[in-house]
């Protein structure tokens, strides 16, 4: 809603309604499983990792995103758009997410596909790992300071398990 208010305050409510309607109708066609991610998540949990999702999406939209992506049903949405008044690159969503799942910032890593994810991780004082698939612009992800960049799921696995 903030973006709509900023760019078209007189139409913000209508634009948000249309945006949510579009997501509800098209999300299953727009989101697909990234091969290897469900297994990587399972392996991380088996290794003792405490996992959670911090997203700029509304909680309901984030839940709807999981179904076509074949992500585990019990993967916690630790922080969603409505949970904080500010959003990435501000660190508040990541800090809230870590608190929600009981994660230790000293050993936490945030994986994201956009420059704002890596900026928020840095501002939260944790390592950020960029992936070049997803919604972000790979060149921007590569240009942002980070703890690693993964162009494939195997590269991400290597970074996270080292």
Give the residues covered by each predicted segment.
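Asp-based, Mg2+/Mn2+-dependent phosphohydrolase catalytic module
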Residues: 42-45, 49, 58-59, 63-162
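N-terminal helical cap/lid subdomain that shapes the substrate entry/recognition surface
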Residues: 1-47, 60-63
